[in-house]
Amino acid sequence: MQKKFEDCVKTILEIIGENPNREGLIKTPNRVFKAYEFLTSGYTQNVKEILNDALFESSNNEMVLVRDIEFYSLCEHHLLPFFGRAHVAYIPNKKVVGLSKIPRLVEVFARRLQIQEQLTEQIAQALMENVDAKGVGVVIEARHMCVEMRGVQKANSTTTTSALRGIFLKNEKTREEFFSLINSAKQVRF
């Protein structure tokens, strides 16, 4: 598999007019393989294992928000990076999940070929199903290199997506609290 991948990278280099055997490019196919192996490692990770190992009984029924989770992903259309921050909240239903597992959940889905809309939905759905939360809210703000480097070439533009489940979708006050906490948190830095 690795050799096939590296051969493809060599072919790409040749097609664009480069010499894959020149000094600066000799190890490039291997480097690209390792980079893509890491950037797509989410395909080999199991969401249930990550979350179920860190579920704890709790009487808490208030919103839990982990914000400003930095992520990097690859656009499935152009294989170019998009990156930004995810804000993930849930309301427990007799169980809470370890706080470090929420960024891990974001990473599992971000380290796949993605579109931002799908990434947002997958995070929300996985948290809702695996934690049995009363509700989940996810907002992602990201910059897309396929927009900034090619096509319309609009540098520094951001895309915002949201996914709401359960009480976040049904209850306006819960939804307002979620969006308010995300926005007010932008003003506070430790």
From Swiss-Prot:
The keyword Endoplasmic reticulum appears for this protein: no
Please give the pathway this protein is involved in.
Cofactor biosynthesis; 7,8-dihydroneopterin triphosphate biosynthesis; 7,8-dihydroneopterin triphosphate from GTP: step 1/1
Name the Gene Ontology biological process terms. one-carbon metabolic process; tetrahydrobiopterin biosynthetic process; tetrahydrofolate biosynthetic process
Q: What class of enzyme is it?
A: hydrolase
Reaction(s) this enzyme catalyzes, per UniProt: GTP + H2O = 7,8-dihydroneopterin 3'-triphosphate + formate + H(+)
Q: What is its EC number?
A: 3.5.4.16
May I have one GO cellular component term? cytoplasm
Keyword annotations for this protein, in alphabetical order, are: GTP-binding, Hydrolase, Metal-binding, Nucleotide-binding, One-carbon metabolism, Zinc
Name the Pfam families for this protein: GTP_cyclohydroI (PF01227)
Q: Name one GO molecular function term.
A: zinc ion binding
Residues binding Zn(2+): 75, 78, 146
Signal sequence segment: none
NCBIfam families noted in UniProt: folE, PRK09347.1-2, PRK09347.1-3
User: What is annotated about its quaternary structure and interactions?
Assistant: Homomer.
* Family statement: Belongs to the GTP cyclohydrolase I family.
* PANTHER family in UniProt: GTP CYCLOHYDROLASE 1, GTP CYCLOHYDROLASE I
Q: State what protein this is by name.
A: GTP cyclohydrolase 1
Native organism = Campylobacter jejuni subsp. jejuni serotype O:6 (strain 81116 / NCTC 11828)
Originating gene: folE
